[in-house]
Amino acid sequence: MNSLQALIEQAFENRQNLSLDTASSDLINAINEVLSGLDNGQFRVAEKINGEWTVHQWLKKAVLLSFKLFPNQIIDAGFCQFYDKIPLKYTDCSNEQFSQSGVRVVPHGMVRRGAYIAKNTVLMPSYVNIGAYIDEGVMVDTWATVGSCAQIGKNVHISGGAGIGGVLEPLQANPTIIEDNCFIGARSEIVEGVIVEKNSVISMGVFLGQSTKIYNRITGEVSYGRIPAGSVVVAGNLPSHDGSHSLYCAVIVKQVDEKTRAKVSINDLLRANQDD
């Protein structure tokens, strides 16, 4: 455990007794260092190590401490004002800085400081919360939201109105993770630390939380909390044991390898299942 982490961990344990007046300058500086590291990609709340996702809980704790200790302030957005504890990421960004970042931000695309946005990403009028990590080549479409500490892989498309859940409110143990080359359909919601593995396609209007049944029609298995790599997923229902009712589920209708995913359009993958 490094000294920065140790300071954050200790402060979080004693958070009930903390206030801006009682917090040390070392703690305030440590929190700001974490927020800056999250903002520029030096830190990330979760990362894949040896094929498994590891969550750095202390970084999340630093974000929570910032909410407790930092006062609200006026944020001038030009067309109106906001009043919040966390400033916006691009408030003071120059034309040169935008050009160097390689990010395109459409008017009303909102990103909080402490979220990392990699190059070749396009943000339509959308919202990205603090602690989120968005890798290269991502499209965040209109009215989509990327929640606090969510992890978005390379070349992901998050369609209009889709929601990727956060972990801060309500407090969740692990962030929601969308791995590389995934497509998230319009108005879908993926929350509560669900992991969508690489090369998967989530159809429009699919809702995934930790309690959502994920039915694999190929194997007949039911699982929770994770979509396997290369899955094509649609919304469905499973009947009760007595046949009196059915309840919502997500259905894995097929699984494709990376080569097939690269050759076949997303629309073709989804439409192929309408004939079954």
UniProtKB/Swiss-Prot annotation:
Pathway: Amino-acid biosynthesis; L-lysine biosynthesis via DAP pathway; LL-2,6-diaminopimelate from (S)-tetrahydrodipicolinate (succinylase route): step 1/3. InterPro entries: DapD_Trfase_Hexpep_rpt_fam (IPR005664), Hexapep (IPR001451), THP_succinylTrfase_dom1 (IPR023180), THP_succinylTrfase_N_sf (IPR037133), Trimer_LpxA-like_sf (IPR011004). Homotrimer. This is 2,3,4,5-tetrahydropyridine-2,6-dicarboxylate N-succinyltransferase. It is found in: Cytoplasm. Its EC number is 2.3.1.117. GO terms for biological process: diaminopimelate biosynthetic process; lysine biosynthetic process via diaminopimelate. Belongs to the transferase hexapeptide repeat family. GO terms for cellular component: cytoplasm. Keywords: Acyltransferase, Amino-acid biosynthesis, Cytoplasm, Diaminopimelate biosynthesis, Lysine biosynthesis, Repeat, Transferase. It holds the Pfam family THDPS_N_2. GO terms for molecular function: 2,3,4,5-tetrahydropyridine-2,6-dicarboxylate N-succinyltransferase activity; nucleotidyltransferase activity. It is an enzyme of class 2 (transferase). It comes from the Bacteria. The keyword Amino-acid biosynthesis applies. Substrate binds at R104, D141. The keyword Acyltransferase applies. It catalyses: (S)-2,3,4,5-tetrahydrodipicolinate + succinyl-CoA + H2O = (S)-2-succinylamino-6-oxoheptanedioate + CoA.
